[in-house]
Amino acid sequence: LADDMPATMADQEVYRPEPEQIDSRNKYFSPRL
């Protein structure tokens, strides 16, 4: 089970969310642009 989900820092770095998710996050974290 743990293999599928990123457990170590390296795994998290390698794993990158989809561009749409990144865009959504940027908009959410930077409301005033």
Curated annotation (Swiss-Prot):
Put simply, this protein is called Pheromone biosynthesis-activating neuropeptide
Which residue positions does Leucine amide occur at? 33
Q: Would you name any one GO CC term?
A: extracellular region
- Biased composition of type Basic and acidic residues is found at 13-26
Please provide the Gene Ontology terms (biological process) for this protein: neuropeptide signaling pathway; pheromone biosynthetic process
Q: What is its main location?
A: secreted
- Domain of life of the organism encoding this protein: Eukaryota
Q: Which GO terms describe its molecular function?
A: neuropeptide hormone activity
Q: Where is this region: Disordered?
A: 1-33
Record's family? Belongs to the pyrokinin family.
Q: What keywords appear on the UniProt entry?
A: Amidation, Hormone, Neuropeptide, Secreted
- What biological function has been recorded for the protein in this entry? Involved in the control of pheromone production in females.
Q: Where in the cell is it found?
A: Secreted
Q: Which InterPro entries does the UniProt record give? A: PBAN (IPR008730), Pyrokinin_CS (IPR001484)
